[in-house]
Curated annotation (Swiss-Prot):
It comes from the Bacteria. InterPro entries: 4OHPhenylPyrv_dOase, 4OHPhenylPyrv_dOase_C, 4OHPhenylPyrv_dOase_N, Glyas_Bleomycin-R_OHBP_Dase, Glyas_Fos-R_dOase_dom, VOC. This is 4-hydroxyphenylpyruvate dioxygenase. One of its GO terms (molecular function) is metal ion binding. It comes from Pseudomonas sp. (strain P.J. 874). Its EC number is 1.13.11.27.
């Protein structure tokens, strides 16, 4: 059921599209996240990787919108797709409300996927064919023989959320973009201050409750991690994508066994402080600590709402991935934001990117 009015008929993410200026950069990353290649495009150098209900489109097609995006930004998420009830209707409405169209070249007998210009100029596709047997993949792709079409992989189920890092002063622009076109609402607002720098984050959620996009911008001090991302990425873009698991410890063990590299674990003090922060949380602290998994949420008055999360290292330029499990908490790990922000800041100081004068 929709949380509020859903004029575009949104129904979750359909896929994220990735591209790289150098060949064979992304395939190994998909593999260490537990994804399997299940299909190849009929006429283009484009491939479908899957795990659970997550679709990753690897676009290696030369002279494509994706290849130009990757040439400018490096290996990156160069597009994303929302599921909608009626793509032509949604597309028409988006254009009437001021969205810019993006033309994607199609071959004969191929679907024309309507797309508008999204974050960093990347296409935001509107897809209404996602039923098993009649999806865009059934029409435009050839499934590989003998490969499970819905591999379980490391137990990742769906795209939980993805973030946009934006230039200072542009958070309101992007919030308005999603509000005006899709009727997103702001569900969380954070102002995270580290010792030297800070960031502001506005978490936007679609009326279907399934598409969640936190927008991040640098606070007035500058020189922090959002600024560093924007410099490295050469513009605004998707900073990380979070995948949902229903057993993060098990997922972590699987990912670790296939070569996933995780962000440096928080200091021991983080785990010593957990009981004080979340009294009677009931999670196995030793197991979490051994894996560097973070815990957040609230546990007041016996009403436990928890969230477990862990991040990969930066795997594509400054872009990384998050693996998350929700036990009643629908936030983004705000309690960990500060803890993590400070640990990233310490890392920036160590690397000499940030001066402590």
């Amino acid at each position: 059921a929709d949380l509020y009015e859903n004029p575009m008929g949104l129904m979750g993410f359909e896929f994220i599209e990735l591209a790289s200026p150098t060949p064979n950069t992304l395939e190994p990353i998909f593999e260490i996240m537990g994804f399997t290649k299940v299909a190849t495009h009929r006429s283009k150098d484009v491939h479908l990787y899957r795990q659970g209900a997550i679709n990753l489109i690897l676009n290696n097609e030369p002279h494509s919108v994706a290849s130009y995006f990757a040439a400018e930004h490096g290996p990156s998420v160069c597009g994303m797709a929302f599921r909608v009830k009626d793509s032509q209707k949604a597309y028409k409405r988006a254009l009437e409300l001021g969205a810019q169209p993006i033309h994607i070249e199609t071959g004969p007998m191929e679907l024309n996927l309507p797309a508008i210009k999204g974050i960093g100029g990347a296409p935001l596709y509107l897809i209404d064919r996602f039923g098993e047997g009649s999806s865009i993949y059934d029409i435009d792709f050839v499934f590989l023989e003998g490969v499970d079409r819905h591999p379980v992989g490391a137990g990742l189920k769906i795209i939980d959320h993805l973030t946009h890092n934006v230039y200072r002063g542009r958070m309101a622009y992007w919030a308005n973009f999603y509000e005006k076109l899709f009727n997103f609402r702001e569900i969380r607002y954070f102002d995270i201050k580290g010792e030297y720098t800070g960031l502001t984050s506005k978490a936007m959620t679609a009326p279907d409750g399934m598409i969640r996009i936190p927008l991040n911008e640098e606070s007035s001090k500058g020189a922090g991690q959002i600024e560093e991302f924007l410099m490295q990425f050469n513009g605004e873009g998707i900073q990380h994508v979070a995948f949902l698991s229903d057993d993060l410890i098990k997922t972590w063990d699987h990912l670790k066994s296939i070569g996933m590299r995780f962000m440096t674990a928080p200091p021991d003090t983080y785990y010593e402080m957990l009981e004080g922060r979340l009294p009677n949380h009931g999670e196995p602290v030793g197991e979490l600590q051994a894996r560097g998994i973070l815990l957040d949420g609230s546990s007041e008055s016996g009403d436990k709402r928890l969230l477990l999360q862990i991040f990969s290292e930066t795997l594509m330029g400054p872009v990384f991935f998050e693996f998350i499990q929700r036990k009643g908490d629908d936030g983004f790990g705000e309690g960990n934001f500060k803890a993590l922000f400070e640990s990233i800041e310490r890392d920036q100081v160590r690397r000499g990117v940030l001066s402590t004068d």
